[in-house]
């Protein structure tokens, strides 16, 4: 049985991991039966498709396969790339995998914009079941959804640490409500239990041709958020998430079966979940509606936190430009707030709400990015298992990837119906990553750093002959074997040399977590190297690390790149660099000690 710590982990997982997939029953079946008639045969077939989609794409792909692949317990698209690239000998193939990972991250961004919009909008539409609100206009529904979204995004800067403890119990209550309402409905139409047999899923696809194929594009809505199992593994641990998934899976299946039973009895139903609850117990409908809106807010909060985490991961692995980051918790450094991401997300979510107007139309745009992410995850897992010689898992992963691709192809029909928006958003994110990484590579080539041997030879001469400034000066250098041009400009052209000069090198490790710092070696008299080895998911306080090691700097020098170019792509890169906070702003180094050194580059 479960221990006390197990229960705590399970409840936390329900609140932080399963919000998205847990709120899918609000709209999934309602949207599906806009595409196909709700006959008993169709209902059983669709239910079977949903159950086996949850089994293959969430349980097998993420809970079993993906969660067996981690780095120090951490999961996600970037982790898969970090695992796969070292296994590949060809540089060209490694570059292709890196490109795939960039596309995967971009799809997650595209998905992240639609999730809060469809979740909140579909829950608010439940107001129409209340007699006094039956005639409420869609404009009012959108306005209420917009107000909820604005309120949610507005509190992010204050941090959510104080209220996250509520998320788990609320979602436990939500899943319990889904399970019990499902059981109550199944009791009157037990024939829906046949849907557990995959025969009915296959039969539905075989007998409905293109309609059946297109229905798959809406069936995938039941699995949106499944990728959170793997992405959040590092925060909550593998075991609590897997144990929570058993309970969540059971609640979801029971509720979908219950909704199926309800629509067999009430084929004219337009908002299946809410009408089912209202018919079962009208007196608890309003509390259930409030609970559903709260659950969608929690799901949206998990998505926002996930986006902050993805962007931070991208910044530390140098695929996304630096952005201003605030720490919203005095206890947990992982509790972060990225203002630029927060407000761009809010604008995008509001655009989705007011562009698509209702959840049915929004569902027509939802799924493309999700299936794209799943397909990339499946392909990368297949290659990892194959290259590690784990053939059975490689075969299963390949089978799941084929299913992912089938779902992806079925979603292509959504492109002219609004699906292009997720592609546009993903394309913007992908273009930003490509321009930034290519620009950084080109800029580094132009920097023409001095080899450490040449630098030391000149340094020793200058240090011995020039008057030295008392105190300690810090210089930041990514690789001490190649000294950045700004350092040689300060020391050799401007003749600014301190008694104690320290090169600070922040080295990103292959592991996601861990921080180690130490003085590496003395390069010469008055010249030392201090290394900070940090995991690519770790949030660090550089100022505190320096203080703990007894470093009392008088001045901090850093490089500023001024880019001159007539090339359009590099002009975009130049604008990105100018709009991005500098290295020292990102790490919040004390402004009264900073001295930026400008170097001009022609690209």
From Swiss-Prot:
The catalysed reaction is:
K(+)(in) + H(+)(in) = K(+)(out) + H(+)(out)
Q: What is this protein called?
A: Probable potassium transport system protein Kup
- The domain of life is Archaea
Topology in the lipid bilayer is annotated as: Multi-pass membrane protein
Look up and give the organism this protein is from: Methanosarcina acetivorans (strain ATCC 35395 / DSM 2834 / JCM 12185 / C2A)
Alphabetized InterPro entries for the sequence: K+_transporter, K_trans_C, K_trans_N, Kup
Q: What is its main location?
A: membrane
Q: Which UniProt keywords apply?
A: Cell membrane, Ion transport, Membrane, Potassium, Potassium transport, Symport, Transmembrane, Transmembrane helix, Transport
Chain segments annotated as transmembrane: 15-35, 43-63, 94-114, 136-156, 163-183, 201-221, 244-264, 284-304, 336-356, 367-387, 391-411, 415-435
